[in-house]
Amino acid sequence: MHNSYFVNYGYAQLIWMLVGDVMSVELKALVLEHSGFNASISGGNGRTIETAIIIHQDGIHDKRTVQKAILWALGRNKQLSWDILGGSVDEIGGRFYESVLLGIRLVDLSGQVKQGQQTIYFDTTEYMKNK
């Protein structure tokens, strides 16, 4: 089982994981609100491979655009900023999963910057099979 992880440098209780309890229906609405397009997504919240955010081909947006729109919308919703630190693609059971490692920053109410890392999982099978 692949799990996302969140490494905090001292203040775990103050930093929420990027996706937290956001469900796919709410995620679609967040992306529409913050990015201005109706992303063709389904699945889970991306915290594990088993709950990966499924990005469907819509013939308009490439997967990177959709991934960044999702991450941007989630960050704005949680008042976080993030950077992509790395990523990988794995094929498991005929499906393709992209993991994106994020560096996350949050300024707490006292003005201190809290930092951590989290991996978000995307199912990009439709894009990989149609290459």
Model segments located where?
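N-terminal trafficking/processing presequences and adjacent post-cleavage segments
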Residues: M1-W72
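Short amphipathic alpha-helical surface micro-motifs
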Residues: S35-G36, L80-S81, L101-R105
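Exposed, flexible binding/inhibitory loops of compact, secreted disulfide-stabilized domains
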Residues: H61, S81-W82, D90
